[in-house]
Amino acid sequence: MTRLGPAVRDGRPAPDAAAGPVTARATYAQERAWLASRLAHDPPTYCAVDEFPLHAAVTADDLVHALYVLMDRHEPLRTVLRTVDGRLRQEVHPRPEPRIELADLSAHDHAAQAEERRSLRARLARTPFDPHRAPQWRAAVLNLGEGAWSVVFAAHHTVYDTASGFNVHAELTELCAAAEEGREARLPRLPLGYGAYARRERERARTGGADAAAAHWRTRLRGLPPVHTVPLDRPRPPARTFRGAEVRAALPVGVTAALTGAARHHGTRPVMLFLAAWTALLHHHSGADDLAVGLPVAGRDDPDTRAMVGTFVNMRVLRADLSGDPDGTELVRRTTTAVRAGEKFDIPFQSLVELLAVPRLPGVPPLYQLAFNHTPADGLGPPVSSCEEDLLLDVAGSGLRLVYDAALFDRSTADLLLADYLRLLAVLLDAPGTRLSALPTGPALRHTPRSTGAAPAARTAPRDAAEERVAAVWRTLLGTDSGTVDVHEDFFTAGGHSLQALRLLARLAPARGSGPTLRTFFADPTVAGLATALKSTPDGRTAWR
């Protein structure tokens, strides 16, 4: 392979060195992605990698120029996120220098090209981004010969989502066509920048529409069980580890062929059949009729966002009703109705958690711990080793994987669940009149005693200056100024949430040096644990890095 190395900037004027970055409040989607990546056992999990095939009589320089045009048009491709006084902000740079590699594979046969491309995708996926530098993307331009090109594009989830990939591919295709034909590119108009969208989003959260959404979700989620009852292989630890693993399978050919017809029969979309089968499986193994399932949604209902590159994904909670032993037809109807109702009342997930004042249990994610994701196109991406939920079923085209919390489940359990799911899905498609109680699943998982924690101990007041300092900030953030803080109480059980934890750490950070990391604070979210860290080194700086 002829590898030409990093690309150089094209012939445009150099960026104005005097121009500084522009700052804006982070969007809700950026907050979620940033927090998740900081807590992850494996940060590269939060890197998306797409490969875009292109066919045009162009040069490598034309494609490098096209990537710079994309970066100039879309603010997230020039953005890095920073915390300022405990709040997350976008820092948009005028023209940062991305890493763009060039490789000539034109002399290779198809098999050798495929292997080189696979290796490159894997390398870009596993290379973490510097969280302090823009841009949060990189690319490789591959010459495949005879007018065939491929651009491998890797980006952090804080600046890029699935829909962004379609937009990047469309714009690259048009820019190549324009270069080939010697004309100006006809690119879609961008009605607003991402920073302006962030401001609009915050403003809408304060309007009457937000009140209607709040009222809907208060009613819909009232009395929701705080944690699922799917049996665990081990008691839940008091702090989340975010350590995950996965098992994969391919959809049987017969299932794939039957999906479209079955969805048409039910008057719904294929995704609803996948989702209904997932809730049926969880019902079988938990015995619960009332289940919460987290659903990632595109978050691009605003027409002004359709052509933008950035991250817009929100999490929505499906409350699945499996009472009364419904058959498959009724279950699909209930699932479709519940999902459609939620689509009318979108609200940022962080706001929903705060709004509902969700009871927090040690080591338990709020509102839902079981999740489902569906992408119509093939491509599950590289294996993951982090997990935000207890269980996530991820369906992409003709493949699926079950991502599981490795602190809670064994691989053998994940294998069993995935095999059960495929059997259950096939019956749901072939015999929708089958009731839940008659579905051909394996034996239900055995219940393992759940950790109940030690018996409540007497409250312990702050015992030294370090604990007093932490407790003072703790009280202010949680609105408990008049009460005594128990130094062993869990921050999240006491009503705190992730963004408040970020502000807590910011206020306690030393004037110089690094402060505690979110991931380590999550491992011991108490006054005592944080105070120990703050006094762990002679100069007062924390040893947590």
What are these regions (language model features)?
Residues 1-41, 65-109, 120, 133-135, ...:
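Short amphipathic alpha-helices and their capping loops
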Residues 3-4, 427-447, 484, 500, ...:
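AMP-binding/adenylate-forming catalytic domain of the ANL superfamily
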Residues 19-20, 433, 437-489, 545:
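Acidic/polar alpha-helix N-cap and adjacent early helical turns
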Residues 31-40, 49-57, 67-69, 83, ...:
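Adenylate-forming
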Residues 57, 471-494, 501, 511-519:
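Phosphopantetheine carrier-protein modules
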Residues 63, 495-496, 508, 530:
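Short, compositionally simple motifs enriched in small residues
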Residues 76-81, 290-293, 518-519:
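Short, hydrophobic-rich beta-strand element in sensory/regulatory alpha-beta domains
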Residues 80-81, 172, 176-192, 220-230, ...:
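A short N-terminal helical cap/helix-turn-helix that marks the beginning
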